[in-house]
């Protein structure tokens, strides 16, 4: 019984001692934390006018001690908050050490080159005259890493190139849809902006493709006729309008539009050219690929037989005539069947 009483009394005294020392230990840890802040400012050489931490140690000792669990949680959160900054500083130190090693290697290589080829044998700095090919290649490989603008790996560069191509393709697709298709039916499996095109005129134009008209304020048309044709001898091309440049323009446009050449020439030749050029501009505004298959050459194109080429109006007229003939034959057949007994 006496031994049990002694054990209980000793354990109770130890428990009371721990309870008394726990607030003191917590207060001591808190004081050391604030002292570390003072130490940090001194290590960073920060003056009092930059960072000033004022702590009343007497009042801090007299304050009631905080709970150890609360202090532990606060310190752990603070350490976790500082860990990303530690990682950034470590990576920065590695980069600085790598740059320092590169500069040291460059300096050593330059010193070796100077030792092998003294300055008396060099006419210009950076242009060795008696160096062998290997030393010249070494000097060419030396460069400042700060000059490199794109610091990325091959995979990243390939990703950027593919992203650029995809973005440009998306812009082209969007432009085709905007210019050639008014409404897109997303439920269709097979569709295209060109095949499903709905004629939507471009704002300010008669077509759905933006075109620009060039106005030449100075050119052959503004010059006197005597100056324009004074230095040229008359050739076979001058028999139509009397001006070689104008005749060439007419031939190019007529070949471009596949018009039948010959016939009476209007009196105002420039008005004729203007009408032809306006027609080309209108057709190219409807579709840029309208004349894509036309190949220009220096020679004039041969005129195809008129019976092989038909316009839309001529085709419509032939179709309507064929319908009328078939309708007339069917009526005649019906009338003959009605007269039969």
From Swiss-Prot:
Q: Which UniProt keywords apply?
A: Acetylation, Cytoplasm, Isopeptide bond, Nucleus, Phosphoprotein, Repeat, Ubl conjugation
Please indicate if the UniProt record lists Aminoacyl-tRNA synthetase as a keyword: no
- Region Interaction with MAP3K12, annotated ranges: 170-341
Its main localization is: nucleus
Compartments (UniProt record):
Nucleus; Cytoplasm
Membrane-spanning intervals of the chain: none
Gene Ontology CC entries for this record? ATAC complex; cytosol; mitotic spindle; nucleolus; nucleoplasm; nucleus
Give the region (Leucine-zipper 1) as residue ranges.
269-283
One GO BP on record is:
regulation of cell cycle
- Which positions does the record annotate as the modified residue Phosphoserine? 91
GO terms for molecular function, please? identical protein binding; protein kinase inhibitor activity
Please tell me which positions the record assigns to the cross-link Glycyl lysine isopeptide (Lys-Gly) (interchain with G-Cter in SUMO2): 94, 127, 137, 151, 233, 299, 302, 323
Enumerate the residue ranges of region (Leucine-zipper 2). 312-327
Which first-to-last residue range defines the signal peptide?
Answer: none
Query: Does this entry carry the keyword Phosphoprotein?
Result: yes
N6-acetyllysine occurs at which residues?
A: 299
Q: Which domain of life is it from?
A: Eukaryota
Under the subunit heading, UniProt states: Component of the ADA2A-containing complex (ATAC), composed of KAT14, KAT2A, TADA2L, TADA3L, ZZ3, MBIP, WDR5, YEATS2, CCDC101 and DR1. In the complex, it probably interacts directly with KAT2A, KAT14 and WDR5.
Task performed by this protein: Inhibits the MAP3K12 activity to induce the activation of the JNK/SAPK pathway. Component of the ATAC complex, a complex with histone acetyltransferase activity on histones H3 and H4.
Protein name from the UniProt record: MAP3K12-binding inhibitory protein 1
Which species expresses this protein natively? Mus musculus
Q: Which gene encodes it?
A: Mbip
């Amino acid at each position: 019984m006496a031994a049990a009483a002694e054990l209980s009394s000793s354990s109770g005294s130890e428990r009371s001692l721990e309870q008394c020392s726990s607030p003191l230990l917590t207060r001591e840890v808190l004081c050391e934390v604030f002292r570390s802040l003072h130490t940090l400012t001194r290590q960073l050489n920060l003056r009092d006018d930059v960072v000033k931490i004022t702590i009343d140690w007497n009042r801090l000792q007299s304050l009631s001690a905080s709970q150890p669990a609360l202090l532990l949680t606060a310190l752990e959160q603070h350490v976790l908050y500082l860990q990303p900054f530690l990682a950034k500083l470590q990576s920065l130190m590695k980069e600085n050490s790598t740059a320092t090693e590169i500069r040291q290697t460059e300096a050593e290589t330059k010193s070796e080159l100077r030792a092998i080829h003294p300055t008396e044998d060099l006419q210009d700095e950076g242009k060795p005259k008696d160096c062998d090919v290997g030393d010249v290649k070494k000097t060419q490989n030396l460069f400042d890493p700060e000059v490199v603008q794109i610091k990325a790996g091959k995979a990243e560069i390939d990703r950027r190139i593919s992203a650029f191509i995809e973005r440009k393709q998306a812009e082209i697709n969007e432009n085709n849809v905007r210019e050639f298709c008014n409404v897109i039916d997303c439920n269709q499996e097979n569709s295209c902006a060109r095949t499903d095109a709905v004629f939507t005129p471009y704002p300010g134009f008669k077509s759905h493709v933006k075109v620009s008209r060039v106005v030449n304020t100075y050119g052959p048309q503004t010059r006197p006729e005597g100056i324009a044709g004074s230095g040229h001898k008359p050739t076979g091309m001058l028999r139509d309008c009397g001006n070689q440049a104008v005749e060439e323009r007419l031939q190019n446009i007529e070949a471009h539009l596949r018009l039948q050449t010959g016939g009476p020439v209007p009196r105002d030749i420039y008005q004729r050219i203007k009408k032809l050029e306006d027609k080309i501009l209108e057709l190219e505004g409807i579709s840029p690929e309208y004349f894509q298959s036309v190949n220009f050459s220096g020679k004039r194109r041969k005129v195809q037989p008129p019976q092989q080429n038909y316009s839309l109006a001529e085709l419509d007229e032939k179709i309507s005539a064929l319908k009328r003939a078939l309708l007339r034959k069917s009526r005649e057949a019906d009338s003959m069947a009605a007269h039969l007994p």
